[in-house]
Amino acid sequence: MAPKGKAGTKGKKQIFEENRETLRFYLRIILGASAVYAAVNLVVFYPAASAWTWLAFAFSSAVYGASYRSMSSMARPAFADDGSLADGGIDLNMEQGWQSECPHPHEPRHLKDVILLTAMVQVLSCFSLYVWYFWLLAPGRALYLLWVNILGPWFTAESSAPGQEPNEKKQRRTGTPPE
């Protein structure tokens, strides 16, 4: 049974250890998916491998590299002069993320989702290169978040110019009723 009340906070050392384990876990996923893809497409089916196979491998490697590097830079700890842990880095395992109301595009959960999506697509593409079309879910999700959190509220916000605000004193003087 979950404890009632406010959730406990994590200490710097716990965040540091969990981040290290999280990065290790995602590195294993990256290496495993890349090894399966390379073994199947670039070793077993080498004669049938086309330029698209090599391009897909390069693309997935670039996505993995960028996502993993971003996650590791977020989780980079800071140490004091005496070698003690001063800051454990950003918690990569937060439930709500940095800002629950407006998700940041480089939030750790989105980067982890990109790594997992790429790994699944990469392994499944051993059966068909058409599986790479599923990777279009990532920019689709990015456009959805852009619309929901930035563009949608901006387009649907009520426009009120500062000079058009009803002035109560002016309304009382002229005798016009407020709207």
Curated annotation (Swiss-Prot):
Keyword ATP-binding belongs to the record: no
Stretches of the chain forming a coiled coil according to its record: none
Protein topology in the membrane: Multi-pass membrane protein
Transmembrane segments: 25-45, 51-68, 114-136
Top-rank taxon: Eukaryota
InterPro entries: SND2/TMEM208 (IPR008506)
The keyword tRNA-binding appears for this protein: no
Predominant place of localization: endoplasmic reticulum
Pfam families in the cross-refs: TMEM208_SND2 (PF05620)
Gene Ontology CC terms: endoplasmic reticulum membrane; intracellular membrane-bounded organelle; vacuole
One GO-annotated biological process of the protein: autophagy
Function in brief: May function as a negative regulator of endoplasmic reticulum-stress induced autophagy.
Family the entry assigns: Belongs to the TMEM208 family.
Name of the protein in question: Transmembrane protein 208
Organism: Gallus gallus (Chicken)
